[in-house]
Amino acid sequence: MEELQDVQLTEIKPLLTDKGSGQHFEDFDGQEHNIETAFGVVHVTMSGNARGNRPVLLTFHDIGLNHKSCFNSFFNFDDMHEITQHFAVCHIDAPGQQEGAPSFPTGYQYPTMDELAEMLCAVLTHLNLRSIIGIGVGAGAYVLSRFALNNPLLVEGLVLINIDPCAKGWIDWAASKLSFWTSNIVEIVLGQLFGDEELQSNLDLVQTYRLHIAQDINQDNLQLFVTSYNSRKDLEIERPIFGSSTPTNTIKCPVLLVVGDSSPAVDAVVECNSRLDPTRTTLLKMADCGGLPQAVQPGKLTEAIKYFVQGMGYIPHVQLSHLSTESVPSASMTRLVRSRTHSASSSGSMEMPRSRSHTSNAQLQSTSNNSLSNQIQETPHTIELSC
């Protein structure tokens, strides 16, 4: 295994600091739409206008959350403005998950995860959006992945946080059914959002989301959404074989996979990484981070997304504000070429599409003084980043 080489990265405190309140999530300026689709009405919040041929940043949240609790604080984070000033932003709420949503009528058939992905086509058509860069968490990451598989020409890039590409096995399915009978929906969702360590140690954060899930999300609608997610199909993606002309079912756009090192989704994200094209995929594992990187490590995630989008050629090379005033940050991002059980299957690539990339393909020469930007934009071979 190659020697680890560190790149310094600023430590950022969590965005969520209120204690014991489920009503503190920041507002996000935007125009709300209720869009009719073949599978029901979807609530959308749109900020800014689509610009020419640029894609729109489109988000999709996890179970137990909505666009407000999953993304608003993150998108209002100062350094995210370095990104969002270049794009319109479209937040999707899964049916019935927005705040104040009424209960569905008795007998309502909630959309499957595949149908949720199909609903996005109607959203893009209604809002006259030509393409997207998707940012999804958990269930939302699955929906965006399915949408990218079905509509590759509409998706230019994906940031997938806590993605699980696999269907639940029979044992997991039975366990989830038993949980519905023996536990309340709030605790079930918390167990999927946070790891055991985080549930015990980060009490303020967990309590914030416990109150939000219990007070702000319609419980009946939430149970339908959770059931739909737990009944998902396997994405059936497979890693292309180098030199083979046999077509494979894989995501064709650049992908940034993100997971906290204590997230319950770590194994699932590594499995997803093993199935994706290594020349288009990057795996970012965040140290000291659980199931909500966008809330706990917004600075690191913002920086990674910025360089990911820069590699696609859409935004200029600008310095993030929190890095411009600190010469010796207290956290580090580590470059790690892995060789473990999954070997090449558990690695990703920082290489971006040649047609859009404005970066150098020179061999990475990393030192402790290099920036994360240099690692992302100059690396021509398969790596994992752990920060």
Curated annotation (Swiss-Prot):
This is Protein NDRG3. Residues 329-387 are annotated as: Disordered. Residues 359-377 have a biased composition (Low complexity). Belongs to the NDRG family. The gene is ndrg3. It comes from Xenopus tropicalis (Western clawed frog). InterPro entries: AB_hydrolase_fold, NDRG. It holds the Pfam family Ndr. SUPFAM superfamilies: alpha/beta-Hydrolases.
